[in-house]
Structure formats: C-alpha cells, structure tokens
Design a protein with these regions (language model features):
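Bacterial Sec-dependent N-terminal signal peptides
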Residues: 1-13
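Beta-strand-rich binding/interaction modules
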Residues: 139-141, 260-277
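Accessory beta-strand-rich segments of carbohydrate-active enzymes
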Residues: 12-20, 40-43, 77, 83, ...
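N-terminal pre-domain segments of enzymes
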Residues: 11-50
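Predominantly extracellular/luminal regions of secreted and cell-surface proteins
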Residues: 38-39, 50-79, 228
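Surface-exposed, low-complexity/disordered Ser/Thr/Gly/Pro/Asn-rich loops and linkers
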Residues: 73-102
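Short, solvent-exposed loop/linker segments at the N-terminal edge
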Residues: 252-262
Length: 277
C-alpha cells in the first residue's frame, strides 16, 4: 500500500523494468543513480525558468526521495518524526501539520534533478515518461514548461526532443501541488455502520486520488498528513523512432455454451510524434 510505502526505506525494485529506459530513481531511499532535491515552493524566489536549468545552485534544498511523497522526504530529512512511531500521527497532537489545516501551499514543493541524454538518442524521438504524480504538477526541462499533469493515476508521455541536449547535462524540475480538496477526518453523516471514518468527510473523493489518504479502517483513521502528495511513481527517459506503439489491448470473445473456442482481437495505438498540427 502506498500509505505504508510513504514512511519506509525504499528497496531495490523486484518488478520488471524495461532495459531500454533510463529510470531516474533517487540515490536517497532507492539507491538509484540520480540526485534529487526538493524545496518548498513558496520559499523559492527564483523563477521556474532558472530552477530548471542545468547547473542551478540549489543551496539549502533538501535531498529528496523519488519516487516518494513530500512527507516521505520530510521525514527522511528529520523535519518531522516517524509517523508510525507512538502517537506521532494523531491529528489532535499536531506534530505533523495536516493539509486541511495548513492549505495547499504548505505541501507544494519543487523537485529537481539533472541527467545526461545518451549520444545514441541522436536523431530519435526523446521521451520523458512520468507514471504518476499526486496531485497536480508542472514539468519543466532545461528552462521550458513542457507539460502539466493532474490526477494521481494518469501517466504522461512528454516529447522532449526539441529541448533535450544530446550528450550533455539536462535539468528536470517538477512543481508538485497537493489535491484540490483534501477533506478532513470528520466522519460522514451517511454510510454503513463501522465505516463512517473511511475517506473522512468524503470531500477527498472530489479529486481523482487515493481516498484512504484521509483515513480508512485498515490504516490511519487520522489519515496521511500530506495526502500522499508527491512523485509517487517512476520517471523514465527513453528514445523511439518515428512510429510509436502504445497501449496494447486484447479482447477475448468465448463461444457459448462450451467455451471451447475464443476469438482474440488485438488493438494498439500507433502515433507519429513528428507530425505537426
């Protein structure tokens, strides 16, 4: 569960990874190859165009865990104590500030890293794949805003070909915003007996996000303080030729009544990212 992963030391992934992709996992928490840093957005005076340039001097920015959440990294940096210890996560103790009380700006953060684009990506289409950010985000590469995201579960494939510097250092900066409606742990006035606290007051359901971030019967009734704000899934870099195939889908139709024959229909999405207009 993500609510558990938020506060645990991340381990080396044991799931399949495409060997043709460069995964931008952080050194912190994941033993990855990339240095990620974070800084509170409303305390960052420089414009995004500067923050997202290679060689930007981060100064007092903190190390960040990516994939991970804002609170994940804040706990890692000893800003807040471990939520799973004792009563640290109790809302009424206010040890870790709650998003519903602080407002969205409190957990809105910049994350940035730098990466090299390999020489063998030359004359190819270069992609940045962002698998999941909770909840909204601005994606900046080398001083340019290349994409916006909203919704916890929607991946984005961003064509960075015209902005990538082949064989050179590149910078990626992502401004991450929490959910629009964080909800509260106040129980709903409706529902089955014993589940009134599930999803708090229900307002978090106005976002496309993880409802149990505000509290559920098998996790913290008091919820997760930042509502799992952050870059919670992988970010990767890869290159393709001019034809791109994505989202394969197989539809099966079984013959009745014996179900001894099946008709299989395979569909894919094919695009040419070099086409303009």
């Amino acid at each position: 569960l993500l609510v558990s992963a938020c506060f645990m030391q991340a381990q080396t992934p044991n799931y399949y990874r495409n060997p043709d992709k460069i995964y931008l996992d952080s050194k912190e928490g994941h033993n990855g190859s990339f240095t990620w840093q974070m800084h509170k957005a409303d305390e960052t005076k420089d414009p995004a165009e500067k923050i997202s340039q290679p060689g930007y001097q981060t100064g007092k920015w903190m190390p960040a865990i990516v994939p991970g959440t804002v609170l994940n990294s804040l706990v890692h940096n000893k800003v807040y104590p471990e939520p799973y210890y004792g009563m640290n996560n109790k809302l009424d103790r206010n040890i870790i500030p709650d998003l519903a009380k602080t407002g969205r700006e409190f957990y809105t953060y910049w994350f940035r890293t730098e990466f090299d684009v390999p020489e063998n990506y030359k004359d190819k289409i270069v992609w940045l794949q962002v698998d999941g950010i909770n909840y909204r985000a601005e994606i900046w590469v080398n001083g340019y805003l290349l994409g916006n995201m909203s919704g916890m579960f929607k991946p984005e494939y961003i064509n960075i070909t015209d902005f990538a510097r082949i064989g050179q250092k590149n910078a990626l900066a992502i401004k991450v915003y929490p959910v629009d409606m964080p909800g509260t742990i106040k129980p709903k006035q409706w529902g089955a007996a014993g589940e009134f606290h599930n999803g708090g007051d229900g307002n978090i359901g106005l976002n496309t996000t993880m409802l149990m971030s505000v509290g559920w019967d098998f996790t913290f009734n008091d919820g997760i303080r930042d509502r799992n704000t952050g870059i919670w899934k992988n970010i990767s870099l890869y290159a393709t030729d001019k034809a791109v195939i994505r989202h394969p889908f197989i539809k099966s139709e079984l013959s009745k009544p014996n179900y001894d024959l099946a008709k299989e229909t395979v569909s894919v999405e094919v695009t040419n990212p070099t086409q303009r207009g």
